């Protein structure tokens, strides 16, 4: 390995160590990280913990809408399926959609923001006007429209959320890009013959990535809430179990009017808990990467 590569690797390792040391000082962030770790492990181990049969209607072992008991700690749904098992399986889809949708949203926003901030001129103005249009339009409404006109499925939900929630990231990244472009070493890079691609990849992107990381963490929380809303409205994938889909099934089963609280509470609390955990992590990351926020 060459000396420059070794030096760059050592710097990245030292930066990661400094980040973790600063992150550990945020108790709320640690609490959110611990909660997300447990939920992610449970979701990954769903086949081992509850098995595949829990999703089957024909092989349900309980009676319809049984209250919590020793056999069914969270009760059963209208088909007699164990709600605890469904909750565990639902975590997989809710987390997957949240992660993928947030990644797509941040990728689009970062691309638009870096290009607009670097090039400027009429092209940047046009990009920002498109961004402003998306900003003034309610994200949920646009996502509902896309999910309605496209075929129903997990990837449809991911795309519907990702392509409608990127404008905030684009605005933030553009502002950061303009700030980076004003620094002296950018002028030196241009004087030495650095092209647009070199400057954006070697100088701009590394400096905006901390902001992108914080925005991604916060975006996952919003994406999970949007996915739950779409599933609750019947626009999710009917072939998989998700927390939002469980809420929709509870509504269709009349759990609200009949007082079957155990059908509504688990998925609702799970959505709130995961959204809160990602928000706590995002705020902690934001505070570490931008110490001025922590002083407020």
Language model segments and positions:
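Alpha-helical transmembrane segments
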Residues: 166, 170, 223, 274-278
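Gly/Trp-centered helix-boundary motif
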Residues: 1-110, 114-115, 122-125, 140, ...
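Short helix-capping/hinge motifs at transmembrane helix termini and TM-loop junctions
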Residues: 46-54, 117-121, 146-152, 226, ...
């Amino acid at each position: 390995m060459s000396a420059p590569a070794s030096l760059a690797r050592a710097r990245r390792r030292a930066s990661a160590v400094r980040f973790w040391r600063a992150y550990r000082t945020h108790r709320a962030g640690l609490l959110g990280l611990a909660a997300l770790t447990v939920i992610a492990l449970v979701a990954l181990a769903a086949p081992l913990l509850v098995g595949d049969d829990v999703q089957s209607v024909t092989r349900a072992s309980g009676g319809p809408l049984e209250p919590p008991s020793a056999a069914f700690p969270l009760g059963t749904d209208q088909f007699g399926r164990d709600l605890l098992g469904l909750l565990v399986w639902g975590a997989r889809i809710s987390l997957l959609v949240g992660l993928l949708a947030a990644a797509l949203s941040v990728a689009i926003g970062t691309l638009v923001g870096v290009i607009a901030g670097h090039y400027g001129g009429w092209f940047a103005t046009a990009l920002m006007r498109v961004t402003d249009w998306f900003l003034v339009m309610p994200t949920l409404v646009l996502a509902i429209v896309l999910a309605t006109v496209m075929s129903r499925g997990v990837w449809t939900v991911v795309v519907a959320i990702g392509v409608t929630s990127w404008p905030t990231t684009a605005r933030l990244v553009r502002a950061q890009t303009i700030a980076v472009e004003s620094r002296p070493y950018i002028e030196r890079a241009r004087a030495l013959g650095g092209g647009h691609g070199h400057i954006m990849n070697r100088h701009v992107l590394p400096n905006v990535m901390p902001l992108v990381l914080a925005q991604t963490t916060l975006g996952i929380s919003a994406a999970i809430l949007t996915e739950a809303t779409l599933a609750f409205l019947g626009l999710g994938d009917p072939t998989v179990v998700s927390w939002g889909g469980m809420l929709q099934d509870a509504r269709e089963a009349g759990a609200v009017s009949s007082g079957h609280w155990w059908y509504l509470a688990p998925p609702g609390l799970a959505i709130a808990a995961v959204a809160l955990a990602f928000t706590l992590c995002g705020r902690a990351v934001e505070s570490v990467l931008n110490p001025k926020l922590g002083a407020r």
